[in-house]
Amino acid sequence: MEITIVKGDITEQEVDVIVNAANSGLLGGGGVDGAIHQAAGPDLLKECQEVINRIGSCPAGEAVITSAGDLKATYIIHAVGPIWKDGEHQEANKLASCYWKALDLAAGKDLTSIAFPNISTGVYGFPKKLAAEVALYTVRKWAEEEYDTSIKEIRFVCFDEENLKLYNKLINSEVV
């Protein structure tokens, strides 16, 4: 399994599934969520509304999968990251859960490639370095435990230079 880091637009990734940094209502919004909803087209919002009508809401740390509308990917996994408060409200555990559950959903559909944004580091205010550490640690731990998986590539798509530098530095460190 390969873990790669790129700078780019998550909506343009040619992978089986992209992960959306979603809100609990799955209704689109700003940042990554808004960009994905806009690029995927109106059918995505309809499908998300059907999911919410069925489950009520998607709390922080959880994830659901939908089709990808007009995107190059086949599926979108909507992972709801935590809003950063002070680090004393299970924020890191909820963030780790987003990555773990997204990988489980992708593997459950026998997908081979998944692209993640930097979940919760925008308007949700999660410290970027800590978020990168949690993300890299979690996907590595998942890969160790799920070594017999269909997933061959886990890609982190960094929108900004700061996250790109953090991920590139951390991927080669012993910290994660």
Curated annotation (Swiss-Prot):
Chain ranges passing through the membrane: none
PROSITE patterns assigned: MACRO
Gene3D superfamilies: Leucine Aminopeptidase, subunit E, domain 1
Disulfides per UniProt: none
Cited Pfam families: Macro (PF01661)
Matching InterPro entries: Macro_dom, Macro_dom-like
Highest taxon of source: Bacteria
Location of the Macro domain: 1-175
Protein family according to the UniProt entry: Belongs to the MacroD-type family.
Protein name: Macro domain-containing protein lmo2759
Organism: Listeria monocytogenes serovar 1/2a (strain ATCC BAA-679 / EGD-e)
